[in-house]
């Protein structure tokens, strides 16, 4: 299997939408923890620590300290702890901000850096007397998650990874030692995500479940702190916590991961310090720290000088070592990184090198963004798009229907009375009316002028005919006008009917849309609930599998211990029930020993084989009379002694 150690694979029901770059620059925080000086009593210290200003002043008053630095150099860090600081002081400054970042969906990294035996493992992992940052973070994190689950109803799942990098090879610390094999690292070209093939994550549901895995890491840390060179004490230790939180109320999903990295000594190893290693092994041992220094140097130069293009150099530096491959996202990526420097103030070269490394890495800016997405967002977006398509199709169909009705009304109106013909008819009617008025006026004048004269029959007939024709034309025009008015009224009624029908359809569509929106909200709630339940089921399933594997491992260990215990020889007493020998006591009918009290109530049997083993030293084999004392049985007869001789046997004395 492949395991993504940079960002946990998100559930298929959630997806991040393409948005604007909301990342914020965040420089790598550097914390210095000084170890008490040795060998500089009654002399002015070379390094002056100011825990209030968080500065370290380097002074070269001693001429024996050869260095290329100036006489006075000041190093500024985010926090400086002097030699009087305790574990509680360091944890008070670090633990709660780290946990708040994890709970808010940010990725984080804590790295310890410094020379060997300067307190790196002690600060990160701790000891039996004083816990370090790692167990304190785990305990506080679970307390907060469980509290949020009780008060807010949030659900969560936690998984852990633990591996070490030794000689440019990665090993899983959560598998038994005989089964540990080198693992392969793989990083896709388009993403920052790093995958470790065949690594075994452990899913935990409480701090009690996590303690056994923390103990495995503590064992490695103690091995490194003690400098046990028979083991891989010169290895880099990486412990990862992945936290997934589901907020049902706000309908959001938060994914965050935390690296806790304990590096081996930052000094360069050679034959004087590692006499048992070959030159190739020493080269691989120094390769990871050198690659880390080169990467930090390249990135800090890029930050100091914007014109400096370090793209090629630091990209190649990432690939120089598996350590830098693992820490790639912590150096300039999407992580809030904190580096804890530990050093001996009495050792000027190593302390100065450590301070310079801290000054360089502090100039690197990471682009940090929270890993918060909508719960079940992909399915909701698919549902939303599907609903929008349905609504669009509904609106398009409604528009097409209305367009068709308008076209039909226009065609009916055009068929009943073309617009041009109607205008012409109205104009002709107006002209005829004007002519008729003029004719009536002329006729009226003629009649008025000829009232005293005798009317001309011919003129009267012509006038009468003209008036009759005009009256018929007027009647026809009025009839056509009435018909047109009736047609217009019918069209108006049809238009009003269509409008009322359209309003009814619109109101029906509104009601349907309201029903669709209601069903959509119900479906979204169901999808959210299903996603939460699915996530919880997956979490419990993984937790069950992890516990089952843990139980099998413990059963196997118990079985091996029982077999080893049974294989250890133990002193045996001379008794009839001893299993130290394979000699069987053969008793036959008629033999003299069968008449002894030891064989009471057994003489009726023709042949009896002893049901217990006796040691080879329990029965005398010499020719002279020798005896042995048999221990009493736990059950049956209590026989004190049996005497066996090569001559005529005598009855042994009865013990009871």
Curated annotation (Swiss-Prot):
Gene3D superfamilies: Kinesin motor domain. ATP binds at residues 114-121. One of its GO terms (biological process) is microtubule-based movement. Its main location: cytoplasm. It is found in: Cytoplasm, Cytoskeleton. Keywords: ATP-binding, Cytoplasm, Cytoskeleton, Microtubule, Motor protein, Nucleotide-binding, Phosphoprotein. Belongs to the TRAFAC class myosin-kinesin ATPase superfamily. Kinesin family. This is Kinesin-related protein SMY1.
